[in-house]
């Protein structure tokens, strides 16, 4: 499903829940998709919406994000800074590689995610698991910078 259709589906689901669909809420949904690869925290999301809708309150952004999380459309990825970074839930299972130095979050597509999730659930004796896999380490840029510093 393409981004535009997905956004329309999310807005329709919000409407079905009785939410008023304001220009600000539409901008929040749209910004989650346009800022998505960056895994934004609330602050950049708020700034993006506020540029077009200066009267938007931070509370509106928080409440809309909370609603989208409750609806299962958005979830939080914890960065190295321990801040909540947002991601629109994708249909595929992928991992996140989080750099402990700069905090960047990289999406990593997996070949056999269902097998991996099933194996982890079996070994850990979990009835179910969220479909999020996260690794932490040091990204290539930070590793290079570190090696230059030690030379």
Regions flagged by a language model, labelled:
Residues 4-18:
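Short, Lys/Arg-enriched N-terminal segment that forms or immediately precedes the first helix
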Residues 21-23, 35-41:
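Short capping segments at the starts of secondary-structure elements
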Residues 61-71:
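Basic amphipathic alpha-helical segments that dock to polyanions
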Residues 41-53:
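DNA-recognition alpha helix
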Residues 26-31:
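Pre-recognition alpha-helix immediately N-terminal to the DNA-recognition helix
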Residues 70-151:
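Non-DNA-binding regulatory cores of transcription-related proteins
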